[in-house]
Regions:
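Short alpha-helical donor nucleotide-sugar binding micro-motif in glycosyltransferases
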Residues: 271-272, 279-284
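Donor nucleotide-sugar binding/catalytic pocket of nucleotide-sugar-dependent glycosyltransferases
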Residues: 147-198, 208
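Short hydrophobic beta-strand element within catalytic cores of glycosyltransferases
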Residues: 309-313
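Conserved donor-binding/catalytic core segment of Leloir-type glycosyltransferases
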Residues: 4, 207-223, 229-232
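A short, histidine- and acid-enriched strand-loop-helix "catalytic/donor-clamping" loop
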Residues: 118-136, 148-151
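Aromatic "clamp/platform" in nucleotide-sugar-dependent glycosyltransferases that forms part
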Residues: 292
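Nucleotide-activated donor-binding/catalytic signature segment of Leloir-type glycosyltransferases, i.e.
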Residues: 254-272
Length: 386
């Protein structure tokens, strides 16, 4: 059973999943990706993991309609074409083709599976909320090209609901839990941080002795950082010793620093090398993600693996599976000022240590090996129907 995954873009978190799939398939796992859309580090790790089974293509052609200035979903239509992609797929001769969604490079994989009567799986992450502004023609397109799909590989319940109710794929099999974060190395590094190490970093940043909340993400509109910073000054009226550490880069970075650096409790650090991020995860009491739109926010399970209570936006598609109110954190609406303030306050009355332990327990079901196992079992099921 030869499996091919066509994925133009992915981050480091996917490498362990691919590695496990290759082991499970007995070395019969292949991937085709884009040179332009992946980082040097990702490609280096991919080649070290899969060798010649990783096909890296270049020269992608893009046609854009609409504005790409916004990073919200459906703000623009981008049509992608990769010269030589169909031939590359044909040369591998896969028994099962996995595509990323319905667009991008997916039509080539779908075409191959249909013409050669091979099995087709689609890895899908979108939710009804993320697709709230999707035009009707796009939904019709997805319904049509998704007709031959044998199995959907999805992240969670909200994606399942969208596929069933929004796109009417109720009868097509689906397996949840196919998304994960590569959090093992991060959690191991956090576990080694000493009390003295934490205090040294606290002194370096000039933190007060209240709770420390951590945000890690892009400094863009979609991540809700503006909404969080806007209400912070009201939060510290009640809890003046609390701290907010903000890590990330993006178009809002300079503006946010200009507006909020005057607050002694706000520490906007900009980009931090990934190899040093563990220090800040170890330092914080609570991790917070106020995103206004996300399929499955990876930093939430990363923080959970590090034993942290989490505050998640209800617009994060992963909140349904990952964040249990009052158990390992709280969900909130970042578009409502009162919701943010109430959530920040709740952690002052919670057992943070117990919440952190629950975070680890919940996240343990969303590891790369478990995601790979679910995907491989789905592949075996559809292949068995040949």
């Amino acid at each position: 059973m030869k499996i091919l995954w066509i994925s133009p873009w992915f981050g480091n978190y996917r490498i362990p999943v691919y590695e496990n799939l290759n082991k499970l398939s007995g070395g019969n796992f292949y991937i085709i990706c884009s040179q332009e859309n992946t980082s040097d580090l990702v490609r280096e790790k991919l080649k070290a993991t899969l060798g010649d089974h990783a096909v890296i293509m270049s020269g992608e052609k893009r046609t854009t309609m609409g504005s790409e200035e916004s990073d919200f979903a459906n703000s623009a239509l981008v049509i992608k074409r990769q010269p030589g992609l169909y031939k590359a797929v044909k040369d591998i001769k896969p028994d099962i083709v996995i595509t990323e969604g319905f667009g991008g490079w997916a039509p080539v994989g779908i075409r191959y599976a249909v013409l050669h009567r091979k099995k087709l799986c689609i890895f899908y992450e979108r939710t009804a909320y993320v697709e709230r502004n999707s035009p009707k023609w796009r939904s019709w397109y997805r319904r049509i090209v998704g007709t031959p799909v044998d199995h959907f590989l999805i992240n969670g319940t909200l994606t399942e609901e969208y596929l069933n109710e929004g796109l009417h794929f109720r009868k097509t099999p689906k397996v949840k839990g196919c998304m994960c974060a590569d959090s093992f190395g991060l959690s191991q590094a956090v576990a080694k941080v000493t009390v003295e190490d934490k205090q040294a970093l606290r002194d370096e940043l000039g933190l007060k002795d209240g709770l420390t909340y951590l945000f890690v993400g892009q400094m863009v509109e979609r991540k809700g950082i503006k909404e969080l910073l806007h209400v912070w000054s009201k939060h510290i009226e009640t809890y003046p010793n609390d701290n907010l550490v903000v890590i990330g880069k993006g178009i809002l970075l300079d503006t946010m620093k200009e507006l909020y650096d005057r607050l002694p409790s706000v520490h906007i650090l900009g980009a931090i090398n990934y190899d040093l991020l563990y220090r800040y995860y170890a330092l914080c009491d609570v991790f917070i993600m106020p995103t206004l739109e996300d399929n499955w926010c990876l930093v939430i399970p990363e923080a959970m693996a590090c034993g942290k209570p989490v505050a998640s936006s209800i617009y994060n598609g992963g909140h349904y599976e990952l964040v249990k109110d009052g158990v390992n954190g709280y969900n909130f609406d970042p578009l409502k000022e009162s919701s943010i303030l109430e959530t920040l306050e709740k952690f002052h009355h919670a057992d943070l240590e117990a919440m952190g332990k629950k975070s680890v327990e919940i996240e343990s079901d969303f590891t790369p090996d478990k995601a790979a196992n679910r995907i491989f079992e789905a592949c075996k099921k559809v292949f068995g129907k040949c």
